[in-house]
Amino acid sequence: MEEELLSAVPCSSLTVESVLRVATAGGLYGLCAGPRDARKIGLSGVSQASFVAKSIGRFGFQCGLVSGVFTMTHCGLQRYRGKNDWVNALVGGAVAGAAVAISTRNWTQVVGMAGLVSAFSVLANCTRTENPNNTN
């Protein structure tokens, strides 16, 4: 039933929802980690507040970017292939990891991050419990 509902929703809508949720979580992480990092480097007052605001924006943007790229790639592949399996998660994770690491311009980091995000994506996809006989 849920699969039928998801197939009726456009990929762009799923991507926007994913970006908003995960970017909010990233912003909250930046709100928690920003003051600690500011104290570590000895900031206080207005400079600390500025650092925290930048941390919120940076973490929110990075998390939203990864989420958006992954969701759009995963959904697009799912629609193109007509299957919802680990291959979609593998490719989506690789593309999302590469998109984040490309700013370093270090190909070792790009490949490493693509592999890491891809592995976590496949692991998350494989650990989902889907029982087709469940009537709940």
Swiss-Prot record:
Annotated region (Contains 4 beta strands), positions in chain: 1-59
What's the protein here called? Outer envelope pore protein 16-4, chloroplastic
Pfam families in the cross-refs? Tim17 (PF02466)
Protein keywords: Chloroplast, Ion transport, Membrane, Plastid, Plastid outer membrane, Porin, Transmembrane, Transmembrane beta strand, Transmembrane helix, Transport
Q: What is its main location?
A: plastid
Q: Which residues cross the membrane?
A: 18-34, 56-72, 86-102, 110-126
Instruction: Please state where this protein is localized.
Output: Plastid, Chloroplast outer membrane
Give the family per the record: Belongs to the Tim17/Tim22/Tim23 family. Plastid outer envelope porin OEP16 (TC 1.B.30) subfamily.
**Function of this protein?**
Voltage-dependent high-conductance channel with a slight cation-selectivity; selective for amino acids but excludes triosephosphates or uncharged sugars. Non-essential amino acid-selective channel protein and translocation pore for NADPH:protochlorophyllide oxidoreductase A (PORA) and possibly PORB.
Q: How does it assemble?
A: Homodimer and oligomers in membrane.
